[in-house]
């Protein structure tokens, strides 16, 4: 039976407003004011990272703030322009637009639409489990790579030099060759903004650091007429709100953007769900991954229709809202109202923002993406996890942002296959004073039952590990110190099987039979029993050699 979707299922955000409590209002208002002060300069900065005019960042912020408040399942998550998606947008569109700014803007909006459609369709199809497609080590390494690419993309902006190239190493090389032509007033201004942001984060973490730093830089430029001395400013920003419309794009461009859009959708959704779950857990709340897919999809469609670019969750804005007391998505609606007011009535002030200050804001955000504590945690946990994270970082730097995403997904899948293809296994024995049977490697005092091998393979059986299972099971028999008479497979971990695995199981049974060893199975659940029957293995093994528990299997061996 296909489950029906209720209105709360499609719009889970409505529930928080139905259950709204007056005592939450102060925190939500404060969070809305703070996030708006953070969002406005950040959105403008990320628009420049995406290769678009600063105004596009504000356009891309408006509709997603309203839509996510209704459709999202997280009460804390902040949606809008974000560093990774902005950088991926630039990586995808720069080669396609070839310097045509109008075409670039059309492609950016189209990319947002495609990302949204992919997420929306995936959410409708209940593919929320894809949130686990990127493992933690891969995500940590990917974000570190993104951060380094973000910094390299801003080298020209914060130094006033001309930096060529669209990838990390080409940008670093170009900057190295032009470092003698640094425009020192621009560089000093950028470093001052970066220093102020760092100090505010340390000494006043609840303060809206970005807006304070950028406004301070703007006042300095205006008072000292620094724009006349070579410091670039944003320039004219259209006042008012964007007029929604479908971008005029060709079928050829749509085809070219489909695969990049899928890559951006994966990163957007995965990062968003991980962030939402982390903050929801602090308050004992739950996040619906399928609802998140639909919400992020709708937000990106709206961003595309309002001449923006792909949007995602922002962990920094989410954390800021949480720390100042935000309890529901009302804070996003308040932030939305402030963004609209600024766009309508204060576009002249935005025009005076120094480009170098926005670049410093991007560098500051990038530095916060490099989580050294997570790298240290990976190193302490398992060396292979650390190497996986470093390999992902190297893939992003060497292959570029988009192909780095594909490499990240591939590395996650390969790591999963490696674990499935060669999982832990164990021979079980009895431990004095402890009920049940346990791994003899974990308990040196464990005693085997002479003539009986009880074997457990700790993974679902499938094509990826079928041969590994058969080979290791026979190795256990060969290494047994006594004469093996029975082999009992503890199937508690083997509920999921495919035909390749059952063929390997039958080959194992046949080989053991040839050696005069009885093959039996214990802890066989009903689903596995049905699979054995469908593959005609149940009769071959024999109902009298299929046991519900390990003790009954051992008793049967002793009564043989």
Curated annotation (Swiss-Prot):
GO biological process per UniProt: transmembrane transport
Record flagged with keyword Metal-binding: no
Membrane topology: Multi-pass membrane protein
Transmembrane helix as UniProt keyword: yes
Residue ranges occupied by any STAS domain in the UniProt entry: 442-557
CDD domains: STAS_SulP_like_sulfate_transporter
Intracellular or extracellular location(s): Cell membrane
Keyword list, A-Z: Cell membrane, Membrane, Sulfate transport, Transmembrane, Transmembrane helix, Transport
Superkingdom of source: Bacteria
Residues making up the signal peptide according to the UniProt record: none
Transmembrane segments: 29-49, 51-71, 79-99, 105-125, 138-158, 184-204, 207-227, 256-276, 333-353, 355-375, 394-414
Cross-referenced PROSITE patterns: ABC_TRANSPORTER_1, STAS
A cellular-component GO term for this protein: plasma membrane
NCBIfam families: sulP (TIGR00815)
Family stated for the protein in its record: Belongs to the SLC26A/SulP transporter (TC 2.A.53) family.
Protein's UniProt name: Probable sulfate transporter MT1781
Organism name: Mycobacterium tuberculosis (strain CDC 1551 / Oshkosh)
């Amino acid at each position: 039976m296909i489950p029906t979707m209720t209105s709360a299922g499609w719009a889970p955000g409505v529930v928080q407003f139905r259950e709204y409590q007056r005592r939450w209002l102060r925190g939500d208002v404060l969070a809305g004011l703070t996030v708006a002060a953070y969002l406005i300069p950040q959105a403008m900065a990320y628009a420049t990272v995406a290769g678009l005019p600063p105004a596009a960042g504000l356009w891309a912020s408006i509709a997603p703030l309203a839509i996510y408040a209704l459709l999202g399942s997280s009460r804390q998550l902040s949606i809008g322009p974000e560093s990774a998606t902005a950088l991926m947008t630039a990586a995808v569109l720069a080669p396609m637009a070839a310097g045509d700014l109008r075409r670039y803007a059309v492609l950016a909006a189209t990319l947002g639409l495609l990302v949204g459609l992919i997420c929306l369709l995936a959410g409708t199809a209940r593919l929320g489990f894809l949130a686990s497609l990127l493992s933690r080590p891969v995500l940590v390494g990917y974000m570190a790579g993104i951060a380094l690419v973000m910094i390299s993309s801003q080298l020209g902006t914060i130094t006033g030099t001309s930096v060529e190239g669209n990838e990390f190493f080409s940008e670093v090389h170009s900057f190295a060759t032009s470092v003698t032509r640094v425009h020192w007033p621009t560089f000093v201004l950028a470093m001052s903004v970066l220093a102020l942001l760092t100090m505010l984060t340390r000494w006043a973490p609840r303060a809206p650091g970005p807006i304070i730093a950028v406004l301070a830089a703007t006042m300095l430029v205006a008072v000292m007429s620094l724009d006349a001395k070579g410091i670039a400013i944003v320039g004219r920003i259209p006042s008012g709100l964007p007029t929604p419309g479908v971008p005029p794009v060709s079928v050829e461009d749509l085809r070219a953007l489909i695969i990049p859009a899928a890559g951006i959708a994966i990163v957007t959704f995965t990062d968003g769900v991980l962030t939402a779950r982390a903050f929801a857990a602090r308050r004992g709340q739950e996040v619906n991954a399928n609802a998140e897919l639909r919400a992020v999809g709708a937000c990106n469609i709206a961003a595309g229709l309002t001449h923006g670019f792909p949007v995602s969750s922002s962990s920094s804005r989410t954390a800021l809202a949480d720390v100042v007391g935000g309890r529901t998505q009302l804070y996003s609606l308040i932030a939305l109202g402030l963004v609209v007011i600024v766009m309508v009535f204060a576009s002249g002030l935005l025009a005076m923002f120094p480009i170098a200050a926005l670049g410093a804001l991007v560098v500051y955000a990038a530095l916060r993406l490099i989580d050294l504590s997570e790298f240290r945690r990976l190193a302490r946990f398992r060396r292979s996890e650390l190497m996986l994270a470093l390999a992902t970082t190297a893939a992003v730097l060497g292959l570029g942002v988009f192909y780095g995403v594909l490499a990240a997904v591939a590395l996650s899948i390969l790591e999963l296959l490696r674990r499935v293809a060669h999982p832990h296994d164990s021979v079980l024995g009895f431990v004095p004073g402890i009920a049940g049977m346990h791994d003899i490697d974990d308990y040196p005092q464990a005693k085997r039952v002479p003539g009986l091998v009880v074997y457990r393979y700790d993974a679902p059986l499938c094509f990826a590990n079928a041969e590994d299972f058969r080979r290791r099971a026979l190795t256990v028999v060969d290494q047994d110190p006594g004469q093996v008479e029975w082999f009992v497979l503890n199937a508690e971990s083997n509920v999921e099987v495919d035909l390749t695995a059952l063929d390997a199981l039958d080959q194992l049974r046949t080989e053991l039979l040839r050696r005069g060893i009885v093959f039996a199975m214990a802890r066989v659940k009903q689903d596995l029993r049905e699979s054995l029957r469908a593959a005609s293995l149940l009769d071959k093994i024999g109902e009298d050699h299929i046991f519900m528990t390990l003790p009954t299997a051992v008793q049967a061996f002793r009564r043989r």
